[in-house]
From Swiss-Prot:
Belongs to the universal ribosomal protein uS13 family. Keywords: Ribonucleoprotein, Ribosomal protein, RNA-binding, rRNA-binding, tRNA-binding. Part of the 30S ribosomal subunit. Forms a loose heterodimer with protein S19. Forms two bridges to the 50S subunit in the 70S ribosome. It comes from Treponema denticola (strain ATCC 35405 / DSM 14222 / CIP 103919 / JCM 8153 / KCTC 15104). This is Small ribosomal subunit protein uS13. The gene is rpsM. GO terms for cellular component: cytosol; small ribosomal subunit. Gene3D superfamilies: 1.10.8.50, 30s ribosomal protein s13, domain 2.
Length: 121
């Protein structure tokens, strides 16, 4: 198993395995393969040390991944909360941030449904 950016990558095609790293999407993985001239259809275990080193070097130089990216995202959210803007308030309350409806749906952000007793007539 190859280890890049602190993540054990499975023995799948290179472009698929690279997406297991937080911050690398399918298109980014293809760009990395293109930049390092590695065949994206090659399995991870078939790569030699020079190819792995080239991939590591491109990722370190051009991409924010794993811990650095998670920290940056968390700091961005904290900044929004500290300045008290609308988006920060929505993050603080655990509600959808990007204008979605909340009268129905929004269960992912709001959590499990809390049933309230209905009004008696």
């Amino acid at each position: 198993m190859a280890r890049i950016a602190g993540v054990d990558l499975p023995n799948k095609h290179v472009n698929v395995s690279l997406t297991y790293i937080y911050g690398i999407s399918t298109s980014s993985a293809n760009k990395i393969c293109e930049a390092t001239k590695v065949d994206p259809m090659k399995k991870m275990n078939d790569l030699d040390e020079a190819e792995l080193a080239a991939i590591r070097e491109v990722i370190d130089r051009e991409y924010k991944v794993e811990g650095r990216l998670r920290t940056e995202v968390a700091l961005n959210i904290k900044r929004l909360q500290d300045i008290g803007c609308y988006r920060g308030q929505r993050h603080r309350k655990g509600l959808p941030v990007r204008g979605q409806r909340t009268r129905t749906n929004a269960r992912t952000r709001k959590g499990k449904k809390k049933t309230v007793a209905g009004k008696k007539k």
